[in-house]
């Protein structure tokens, strides 16, 4: 309910009826002798005390999940469910190789993939909803994580084919000073990385931006339509540029801007050894991509 802020939506997400969920919340309020939620006709508002109870509940669930992990790991590694969270600017480009890896190397592993933005992934990891994340490092967030680097990749400048920079072998970063750089909407870590690169080059981009996209596929179509240029991770270039012949790509001169991709887990997880082996196997599966493996 705290996630959906609505009894009907929360009941549907938890596989129960709305009256049953409402009754359970009311019973908890009676047991504690305090109001935890404000009920309105449009949404549920968590009271300040309710937020504190919610924090305690999340810690209890996380501890329960850790206990389940420990029992599962003691039985046999790489068996049972594994909930993997992946950021949207990684999922379409690495999942094909990752899924093949899981099927061949870990046939008894029940992989569940969750594509979400970084803040949601980190919350899910801390709460025990997710086991391991595949995202840009450092992972950040308010809760500690154990980060396992996998590879570094460069960003590539993507332009319309008739752009003055199209066809050049490479460009310096300071070309960004004079370009209309299109960005993803707020909440994507790739947006923050692109903003940092532009600022390092001296470009003063507005935080809000006039044109924003929810995903990389839309972003490159905006570039193809002549609205500006953008920065793409090298792993996304072949997939996204292959959707249209109205794009050109230009490499940045060394040292090229880029990002580091890796795994993030909870510190002290009972499956730490599994995650390390998983990372090593994943590095081997990604060596054919345009990346620099981090051992």
Which residues does each PLM region occupy?
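Short helix-boundary/capping micro-motifs
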Residues: 1-20, 41
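A short LG(V/I)-centered, amphipathic sequence patch enriched
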Residues: 9, 29-46, 51
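Interdomain hinge and pocket-entrance segments immediately C-terminal to HTH DNA-binding domains
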Residues: 42, 48, 72-91, 105-110, ...
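Central regulatory/effector-binding core of bacterial HTH transcription factors
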Residues: 79-142, 204
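A late-sequence structural motif
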Residues: 94, 249-292
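Hydrophobic hinge/microswitch elements
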Residues: 117-130, 136, 183-250
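Secondary-structure junction motif
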Residues: 136, 165-166, 172, 180-201, ...
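Beta-alpha-beta core module
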Residues: 142-149, 153, 168, 175, ...
